[in-house]
Amino acid sequence: MRYKIKFKVWLEKDKDIVMGLGRDKLLREIDRLGSISKAAKEVGMSYKKAWSFIKAMEKRLGIKLIQTQRGGKGGGGAVLTKEAKNLLNEFEKITKEFEKLTEKLSKNE
């Protein structure tokens, strides 16, 4: 029988999700675009939902993930903190390990 192995990775703390593919994409888009509203639009969610994800992650992890600057003459913006970048790197490593495992298991069928 031929089948394809699939997986979904997320990180939890005290049974609450702190990172998954959607949150990973949101943070990466904030890093790329320098804006929470632009990143939210890019990943197909409302600004309010994006902020709620960020605040929930920060609360659960006990760290600041985003540094924001209010709009105005020079414009606002958002940048990832060092801790957020570390979290993204760790999540990417974990995801890649799962990808390697599924490739290995698929070859052994």
What are these regions (language model features)?
Residues G44-S46:
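Central "turn" residue of the DNA-binding helix-turn-helix
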Residues K59-K64:
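Residue cluster at the C-terminal edge of the helix-turn-helix DNA-binding motif
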Residues R2-K15:
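Short, Lys/Arg-enriched N-terminal segment that forms or immediately precedes the first helix
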Residues I17-L27, K48:
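Short alpha-helical elements of helix-turn-helix
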Residues L33-A40:
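Short helix-boundary/capping micro-motifs
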